From Swiss-Prot:
<dbReference type="InterPro" id="IPR050418">
    <property type="entry name" value="D-iso_2-hydroxyacid_DH_PdxB"/>
</dbReference>
<dbReference type="InterPro" id="IPR036291">
    <property type="entry name" value="NAD(P)-bd_dom_sf"/>
</dbReference>
<dbReference type="InterPro" id="IPR006139">
    <property type="entry name" value="D-isomer_2_OHA_DH_cat_dom"/>
</dbReference>
<dbReference type="InterPro" id="IPR024531">
    <property type="entry name" value="Erythronate-4-P_DHase_dimer"/>
</dbReference>
<protein>
    <recommendedName>
        <fullName>Erythronate-4-phosphate dehydrogenase</fullName>
        <ecNumber>1.1.1.290</ecNumber>
    </recommendedName>
</protein>
<dbReference type="InterPro" id="IPR020921">
    <property type="entry name" value="Erythronate-4-P_DHase"/>
</dbReference>
<comment type="function">
    <text>Catalyzes the oxidation of erythronate-4-phosphate to 3-hydroxy-2-oxo-4-phosphonooxybutanoate.</text>
</comment>
<feature type="binding site">
    <location>
        <position position="45"/>
    </location>
    <ligand>
        <name>substrate</name>
    </ligand>
</feature>
<dbReference type="GO" id="GO:0008615">
    <property type="term" value="P:pyridoxine biosynthetic process"/>
</dbReference>
<keyword id="KW-0560">Oxidoreductase</keyword>
<feature type="binding site">
    <location>
        <position position="233"/>
    </location>
    <ligand>
        <name>NAD(+)</name>
    </ligand>
</feature>
<comment type="subunit">
    <text>Homodimer.</text>
</comment>
<dbReference type="Pfam" id="PF11890">
    <property type="entry name" value="DUF3410"/>
</dbReference>
<feature type="binding site">
    <location>
        <position position="258"/>
    </location>
    <ligand>
        <name>NAD(+)</name>
    </ligand>
</feature>
<feature type="active site">
    <location>
        <position position="238"/>
    </location>
</feature>
<comment type="pathway">
    <text>Cofactor biosynthesis; pyridoxine 5'-phosphate biosynthesis; pyridoxine 5'-phosphate from D-erythrose 4-phosphate: step 2/5.</text>
</comment>
<dbReference type="Pfam" id="PF02826">
    <property type="entry name" value="2-Hacid_dh_C"/>
</dbReference>
């Protein structure tokens, strides 16, 4: 059995190696010729899987995408050809949630404006949006949710309209899929008009899809409204963001919010489990055995007295400033955007760090934030 996998998917050899011959490829440049004799195709969001890509293949047994979204997959085509498909919903939700939370802490530090006491609006309350909520509520932050589709589906949580969210929130974090049609389309959800409606000193964080914000309109807006602070992990026109936008963004990264080692491993592992179901074989490997130990497995904490201390603890796991600096230096280089994504292999989730409490202050709330082994 031939397994064709994106070269940037981790742990493919360890998980799938016993099932067949593995060939890794550049997912953004995948061709029908490469795919024609594959039995299994494993991709990420950079690969569009449709009739054009699969036209020469008549033996495909499974397509897996190590992503939450499926907008790059022609699901109707796969179904019409009886090709089993699985994505990995929620695989990197924790990573995205922690990334957005860390970005807010970094903004708070840079502009001397504490996150504590702000109201945060989450646009899109699915897996990733909910993961942000978990971090924020663990820290005692008030959160408002906007997600008309979930609201209409009967989700029991409280929701507000987008206009209400914009009016009442100090911070807005975007976590929607990209949809181009329909009553609740998200393509250019934040267009010129909506950007201009943002309250003074709003923070806007986008970790979902670049086209949710009209990037050209954002440049014009930021030229007039420097009070609004912006964090972009995703960009219109990836992998070639508008160079003129970058100077107006407070923190820039190359679509890596979900790129923790845990999130990547989780995505590959979900596909391993799904393929085992399709092949009707036992999935006997364990994800935990794949992950390396953190450089420091345990940090002793006397107290978390302020946000500066919390941010310092978070930086033990991930320092956003490093990726921001690297992005500004490399994104204009040949294939710089994709090069940074491919080599983003160092980030961990809070759970990788054990926190020991040596003081009298209660820091047990850190376990709700995701840190492991919080001890008295």
């Amino acid at each position: 059995m031939k397994i064709l996998a994106d070269e940037n998917m981790p742990y493919v050899q360890q998980l799938f190696g016993d099932l067949g011959t593995i060939e890794t490829v550049n997912g953004r440049e995948l061709t029908p010729e490469q795919v024609k004799d594959a039995d299994v195709l494993l991709v990420r969001s950079v690969t569009k899987v449709d009739q054009a890509l699969l036209a020469e293949n008549n033996r495909l047994k499974f397509v897996g995408s190590a992503t939450i979204g499926t907008d790059h997959i022609d699901l109707d085509y796969l179904a019409s050809h009886n090709i089993p498909f699985s994505n990995a919903p929620g695989c990197n939700a924790t990573a995205v949630g922690e990334f957005a939370f860390i970005a807010m802490l970094e903004l708070a530090q840079r502009f001397n404006s504490p996150l504590k006491g702000k109201v945060v609006g989450i646009v899109g309350a699915g897996n990733t949006g909910t993961a942000v909520v978990k971090c924020l509520e663990a820290y005692g932050i008030e959160v408002l949710l906007n997600d008309p589709l979930l609201e209409q589906s009967g989700d029991p949580r409280d929701f507000v309209s987008l206009d209400t969210l914009i009016e009442k929130c100090d911070v807005i974090s975007l976590h929607v899929p990209i949809t181009k049609t329909g009553e609740h389309k998200t393509w250019y959800l934040f267009d010129e008009q909506r950007l201009n409606s943002l309250a003074e000193n709003t923070w806007l964080v986008n970790c979902c899809r670049g086209e949710v914000i009209d990037n050209r309109a954002l440049i014009k807006f930021k030229q007039q409204r420097d009070d609004v602070k912006v964090v972009l992990d995703v960009w219109e026109g990836e992998p070639n963001p508008m160079p003129e936008l970058v100077p107006y963004v407070e923190f820039c990264t190359p679509h890596i919010a979900g790129y923790s080692l845990e999130g990547k491993a989780r995505g590959t592992y979900i596909l391993y489990q799904k393929l085992a179901e399709v092949l009707q074989i036992s999935a006997d490997k364990q994800m935990e055995s794949l992950l390396p130990a953190l450089w420091s497995e345990r940090v002793l904490v006397q107290e978390i007295s302020d946000e500066r201390a919390l941010l310092q603890l978070a930086r033990f796991v991930y320092d956003l400033r490093d990726d921001d600096e690297l992005f500004r230096k490399q994104f204009l280089n040949n294939q710089g955007f994709d090069h940074m994504r491919k080599n983003h292999t160092h980030r961990r989730e809070f759970s990788a760090l054990k926190v020991g409490n040596t003081g009298q202050t209660n820091v047990n709330w850190l376990s709700n934030l995701g840190f492991s082994g919080v001890e008295l």
